[in-house]
């Protein structure tokens, strides 16, 4: 079946006694609304990724099913996980800590005072890309941080305890009056001010 079958997935989880569930915030929102409170009775771990976890979705799952959603972060090139909240190392509104053996560097971004552009390397990083202009030649990752490093294109902040907060994509910032502004924040403010309308 497809994850878009919002009523079927909870039924399958119930019938098959699933103990782990992975999904995006969007899918988990729909599953949470469509499911009966007992559908996820065997589920012990719910992991969210690929997009920011909506706090309302996290609250819905905690109240309706007694399950805390563990948010993670990664990229396809990194097989795909880089950071993850766990039951014993959890901090709300973050994507958790880096997995063991994942190295990271933050490269400053002009106009952004907090955090930096995330570059990573580790055993889970791809070997490289095959590019159309050089068929059959593997191009290893290369970034500002050096050979073997992958530029995620994301601006993140890391707190004193090692928890990572994704601030946005570098391409999703605009320079306004000399200051870098996250377009996602503008969208969130517009939605909060007028939730019944679509916003660009």
Regions found by a protein language model. Give the residues of each.
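Conserved AMP-binding/adenylation subdomain of ANL enzymes
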Residues: 1-20, 34
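AMP-binding/adenylate-forming catalytic core of the ANL superfamily
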Residues: 14, 21, 116, 122, ...
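Gly/Ser/Thr-rich phosphate-binding loop
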Residues: 18-23, 32-91, 103-105, 110
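Alpha-helix capping/helix-boundary segments
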Residues: 26-28, 53, 125
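Core-facing hydrophobic residues within beta-strands of well-ordered domains
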Residues: 40-43, 99, 197-198
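Active-site glycine-centered loops adjacent to acidic/histidine catalytic or metal-binding residues
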Residues: 50, 74, 96, 154, ...
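Conserved ATP/PPi-binding loop(s) of AMP-dependent carboxylate-activating enzymes
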Residues: 94-101, 110-142, 179-181
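A structural signal for short hydrophobic beta-strand segments in well-ordered beta-sheet cores
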Residues: 104-106, 137-139, 154-158, 200
């Amino acid at each position: 079946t497809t994850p878009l079958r919002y009523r079927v997935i909870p039924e399958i989880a119930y019938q098959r006694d699933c103990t782990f569930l992975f999904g995006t915030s969007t899918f988990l929102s729909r599953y949470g609304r469509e499911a009966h409170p007992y559908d996820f009775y065997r589920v012990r771990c719910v992991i969210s990724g690929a997009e920011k976890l909506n706090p309302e979705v996290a609250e819905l799952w905690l109240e309706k099913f007694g399950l805390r959603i563990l948010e993670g972060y990664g990229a396809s090139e990194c097989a795909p996980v880089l950071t993850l909240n766990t039951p014993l190392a959890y901090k709300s509104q973050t994507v958790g800590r880096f997995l063991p053996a994942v190295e990271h560097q933050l490269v400053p971004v002009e106009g952004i005072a907090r955090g930096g552009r995330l570059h990573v390397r580790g055993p889970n990083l791809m070997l490289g890309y095959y590019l159309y202009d050089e068929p059959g030649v593997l191009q290893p990752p290369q970034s500002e941080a050096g050979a073997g490093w992958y530029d995620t294109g994301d601006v993140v902040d890391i707190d004193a305890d090692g928890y990572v907060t994704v601030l946005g994509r570098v391409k999703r910032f605009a320079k306004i009056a000399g200051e870098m502004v996250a377009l996602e924040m503008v969208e969130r403010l517009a939605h909060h001010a007028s939730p019944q309308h679509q916003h660009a």
